[in-house]
Amino acid sequence: MAIHRSKIEWTDYTWNPVTGCRHGCPYCYARRIADRFRPQACERPEEEPMESLRKGSGMYWLKKPSQIVDQNGHRLRGTPYPKGFAPTFHEYMLSFPQHLEKPSKVFVSSMGDLFGEWVPDTWIEAVFESAKKAPQHTYLFLTKNPQRYYDLAFKKKLPQEKNFWYGTTITGPEQRFFCIRGINTFLSIEPILEPFPVGIVNWPAVPGWIIVGSMTGPGSKRHQPQREWIESINHICAEARTPLFMKNSLRQIWGEDLVQMYPEGMPSWTPGHKAIPHCKACLCRIEYHEGKRGTSIFCKAMGDKHVGARYARTSPPWCPKRADITDFD
């Protein structure tokens, strides 16, 4: 379990240093995935790398990847969910963003709620500190418990980094969300279960980005939104000049011309884009002699580490000193 390329349209990767949730949403896709990969009948997780946070707390701490074993103790396979959807801190995953050198959008804890009221501050702080060590990425946090954001901000424990975005999941217009001036915030209206009538929605402020999508998975056909609901959200965003991102799940309702906008400053470049030819003005370019193969040009972006060997004779698109490139699209 590491940073994975994501099928979620609005992000590039998912990173899950904390998994599990206690909200009990009936439409939760993450719980279905965790139940699929948890130990099944006649199986159990290997206990060695796992610690219980407190006896009887139902919360766990993993210092290394867990294995599933049979009744005789023979290893069967690895699993990131040895206790299913119980809240779990995967300490061994904290450094993973540093191994991903291309600037990317990273959805943090897609398989849980990092800001659930049951999560210790120490877990959240460890995730924040790890994210700060890889500042080339844009980190997208999402919760159904926005009060935790306010609590952390009051205790001065909520970083205000330009590449940190704090999101709230809501399903209707009356639900509370997090929005403070000077902090990047966004809304994920998914699944949208209620109408958002124009003129009735009375939000004190509109976040800097809004994502909207419909319910997917078993039983979702009975809970599809009406087009008018989406039009209302589109109107709200247009009035507030807030970028709107419609997920692909709305294609059958909205049509092919989905609105998929990102906030200004958030990289819309994705890892699939091609390398850009080397720029002579790059301040990080170095020459590396390879014997009979001659001289190759690399980009030294982080300390003494050579970044992007696959881009020999090119400057990687994520190079922080590319003077000639400001837009990777």
Predicted features and spans:
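Structured loop/turn residues at beta-strand edges in well-structured enzyme cores
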Residues: 23, 101, 205, 277, ...
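Auxiliary Fe-S-binding modules of radical SAM enzymes
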Residues: 1-14, 37-44, 50, 58, ...
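Residues that flank catalytic or metal-binding motifs in active/ligand-binding sites
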Residues: 11, 162, 315
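Short, solvent-exposed secondary-structure boundary motifs
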Residues: 84-86, 168, 273-279
